[in-house]
UniProtKB/Swiss-Prot annotation:
First and last residue of the signal peptide: 1-23
GO CC entries: plasma membrane
Source species of the chain: Streptococcus pyogenes serotype M3 (strain ATCC BAA-595 / MGAS315)
Protein family membership: Belongs to the OXA1/ALB3/YidC family. Type 2 subfamily.
Annotated protein name in UniProt: Membrane protein insertase YidC 2
Covalent lipid adducts (N-palmitoyl cysteine), residues: 24
Annotated function: Required for the insertion and/or proper folding and/or complex formation of integral membrane proteins into the membrane. Involved in integration of membrane proteins that insert both dependently and independently of the Sec translocase complex, as well as at least some lipoproteins.
Compositionally biased intervals (Basic residues): 293-307
A Pfam family matched in the record: 60KD_IMP
Gene name as annotated: yidC2
Keyword annotations: Cell membrane, Chaperone, Lipoprotein, Membrane, Palmitate, Protein transport, Signal, Transmembrane, Transmembrane helix, Transport
Covalent lipid adducts (S-diacylglycerol cysteine), residues: 24
Main localisation: membrane
Topology of the protein relative to the lipid bilayer: Multi-pass membrane protein
Amino acid sequence: MKLTLNRILFSGLALSILFTLTGCVGRDAHGNPKGMIWEFLGKPMSYFIDYFANNAGLGYGLAIIIVTIIVRTLILPLGLYQSWKASYQSEKMAFLKPVFEPINKRIKQANSQEEKMAAQTELMAAQRAHGINPLGGIGCLPLLIQMPFFSAMYFAAQYTKGVSTSTFMGIDLGSRSLVLTAIIAALYFFQSWLSMMAVSEEQREQMKTMMYTMPIMMIFMSFSLPAGVGLYWLVGGFFSIIQQLITTYLLKPRLHKQIKEEYAKNPPKAYQSTSSRKDVTPSQNMEQANLPKKIKSNRNAGKQRKR
């Protein structure tokens, strides 16, 4: 059940990213971008792409790469903060596994839906008692802050005048590129593989779907859009790898050491449920009520005496 839920979540995420990118910026009747995100973020990015391409004489391909590097560098701290929150929750869950294991076992061995729900409620209470928030590692606010930048850069790479008629290293930026799509898929597959190396074997089994979902999603989006947008995804893939390397080899080891020291001073204790379990043993009165009543054999005896 948990694995199926993960597959649904990651598949939904893969499909929603493209819709989110296109949804942050509106379009007018002629299909041109419009709206606040475009005016305050997209237009300046488009201006700098045009500046590096024409005024600096670098060409539109290199201009897209430079502007994407600048934008991704600015929002990298938000991505790292999001990774830090997720890693912190993950490390705490790993240390508290012996505490939650008996409750998880009861969930699996539940004989009825009521027993399962009661155990799940107890698990959530135990997680709260130990400072665990299952959704706390998602970090919605940093992601929401990043999405307008992603969306603005996406449209700037697609709609800046001159991009569609330019080439970069023999690649037509106005057309789809199979070579660029293959490179992008390889980058995001490597990033997914790195993320798998940072988790336990049990979590790795549950995350297998994600390892293939992201590259497949990037293949779909990159090959469906002009190569100019593909350059944006290409640079984004390198930054995703950089962020994952920092998370795997810097953040997680430090968090592991920190949490280990915390629990060495204050070892986690088994969770004691405050609510007593409901006694489902039938009482003596209930047993007697459920017994079949004896048929009175002398029910007509009184009538016969009166005769």
